[in-house]
């Protein structure tokens, strides 16, 4: 079967857009072909900085004929109706129609229409111009002489050529002719911009990829990535060093080169006095280079690794020299930031009111930066006030949390008032991703307690499902307070996540709170701390009066379900223990854990079956309007099974309630498991729907006691199975 090769070659595509663009090309083309009636065996996309390529294998040469039967009017219909039918069906005369008979409706005309299939080449030529014109680039531009015309092509960078060939492996391929803005599809591409700029004639994918490789273009991005990673590790190893792995940088650099060549440069060792994080980001952000270190060491070496797109005649000496000059200049700037951040600010007198407000020591550089942050009224959010106001709110929440968690209040308060100070440092101004990290370093330099320095860095954590969770009590209190203020604040101004949109990362903040509580094994009822957060906010913004606690708690429940589900818990078991007012996340998780263990054991499965039978009977009766009593009358018992079940329920309920009081949910489940046998015997021996209405009502009340007893630990009616 024929194969289809498409290449869209342009000026350099931004690295961050390449992978998605190639995927978009594959989806748009294959969807259009399938919609037109074609099928294919497989498709794979490729990309380099200058081209998007699509290889479609086993594409039908022609779409199948479509047969359609169109029903017309009765044979005795008027002439106007018949003429309309002929026009709609595309028939020249009524003699071309068939007559069908229906016992009820009589004879009527039917047109058998055959829509012939189309050649795949015609379909491709038809769909490709629209796909190219409407391509979903995040940003695009017009270029060339055609750009002055209305409706001219927009592409991420100027589009230079289009390859589109079609044909079976056993025959010569054909160019599918179409044009977009004066660019006509052909079988001509070009290799590396510098090493092989000559035109290359290609036939099908294997030939295309092979010729590009000879023209210094590695088409497969994953292979380029492997080459860069392996060569970088090897050159580091050869110099007695190890590469500091950076998957994000590796992905970006892969999108910057078509013919990767890995080289090593160096800078003066004196720059190693700068924190490693600053060195790494300086070299990564500005020069797209990797850093190295001694094997097993934390600190960096003065060697960096760069990736070139050309094979230089001098072995890369000039490239290394040029990159080294830029790296040294950038590191010189970074050293300047680092030293300035440790010095005094020039306007300390004006910072005294802010210093008094937060108990800051203006003799210390980090305290000065916090005072400056407050004095400048730097906005956190237009509706939520300044960063200084936010720090004041976080302080209130963190001190309340410290009372519950047992964290040292003085250390918590000191951590909070310095937590955002590094936002006014030059290092964080240059590299915002270092916030918290630089605060930690400056705190250590000015002699802060280790718990304070750690809390400054850790209060942003965890920032995702795989990020480390702070375990120190001070760090945990500040991290929780920071996130609770964020969530309560944005809920109060009705800036909640909607659908896939979450501009303030509130889902991540809620997950952070959940992980801090569960992984820290912290007993922390959320509702009281929502109140603390809202009270702190309303002290500053009295106009924010809405009650958001119930809605915010429901949001936490949703995120908790996702978190527990990712850990393997069943949704139905989570729902079974979750009530709308439950705000102790650790207790919810423990209940789910205990219920999971119980319900997967034989005793639990059997009790579940009996309990569900009881709740179903009760639900049916209550739907009819029957009121089920919450007490039973032992005088109405007629069978031993009733008496035994009643006694067992009382004993199991007492034991379960006592275990729950001790927060021993496994023992509570074990107590309930003793109901299994008496419940089974009851349903085997007792007819609930007795003719005597009093006995029937009493037996329904007995079923109600089963529901109440099991309801102490979970709503068994929500458990599937």
From Swiss-Prot:
One of its GO terms (cellular component) is cytosol. It comes from the Bacteria. InterPro entries: DALR_anticod-bd, Gly-tRNA-synth_bsu, Gly-tRNA-synth_heterodimer. It is found in: Cytoplasm. Pfam families: DALR_1 (PF05746), tRNA_synt_2f (PF02092). Its EC number is 6.1.1.14. GO terms for biological process: arginyl-tRNA aminoacylation; glycyl-tRNA aminoacylation. Keywords: Aminoacyl-tRNA synthetase, ATP-binding, Cytoplasm, Ligase, Nucleotide-binding, Protein biosynthesis. Signal peptide: none annotated. It catalyses: tRNA(Gly) + glycine + ATP = glycyl-tRNA(Gly) + AMP + diphosphate. Its main location: cytoplasm. Belongs to the class-II aminoacyl-tRNA synthetase family. Tetramer of two alpha and two beta subunits. PANTHER family: GLYCINE--TRNA LIGASE, CHLOROPLASTIC_MITOCHONDRIAL 2, GLYCYL-TRNA SYNTHETASE. This is Glycine--tRNA ligase beta subunit. It comes from Sinorhizobium fredii (strain NBRC 101917 / NGR234). The gene is glyS.
